[in-house]
Amino acid sequence: MARVKRAVNAHKKRREVLEKASGYRGQRSRLYRKAKEQMLHSYTYSYNDRRKKKGDFRRLWIQRINAASRANGLTYNRFIQGLKAAEVEVDRRMLAELAVSDENAFAALVQVAKDALPEDTSAPRTAA
């Protein structure tokens, strides 16, 4: 049986890892073992942050919608409640885009939400 030499494959593998780790500081960009460990951690961070990004954007959209709806005299909660009552199916991403880019259209949506909201007949809340 022929002898298998693995030097070429080993060097190629190590070179690829070190190239991927080229932007890291210190030993993490120069030593193979440290670079490999850091690459494994970085893959985990990337995976987790791709999922975290979705929540981050949702929070940003809600903040933008809340600010714009308060400027039009309605809180975020009541605005969303009014849109659901009016059966308007616009997602938060589009609402946030309207709030930033087209204030007149957003104001029209706020008016639709206000019209669809039931009148609050309960007694006003008092601090207990």
From Swiss-Prot:
Record flagged with keyword Transmembrane helix: no
Gene encoding the protein: rplT
Protein name: Large ribosomal subunit protein bL20
Organism of origin: Kocuria rhizophila (strain ATCC 9341 / DSM 348 / NBRC 103217 / DC2201)
GO cellular component: ribonucleoprotein complex; ribosome
Molecular functions (GO terms): rRNA binding; structural constituent of ribosome
NCBIfam families named among the record's database cross-references: rplT_bact
Domain of life from the UniProt record: Bacteria
Annotated family: Belongs to the bacterial ribosomal protein bL20 family.
Gene Ontology terms describing biological process: ribosomal large subunit assembly; translation
Tagged with keyword Ribosomal protein: yes
Functional note: Binds directly to 23S ribosomal RNA and is necessary for the in vitro assembly process of the 50S ribosomal subunit. It is not involved in the protein synthesizing functions of that subunit.
Keywords: Ribonucleoprotein, Ribosomal protein, RNA-binding, rRNA-binding
Alphabetical list of PROSITE patterns matching this protein: RIBOSOMAL_L20
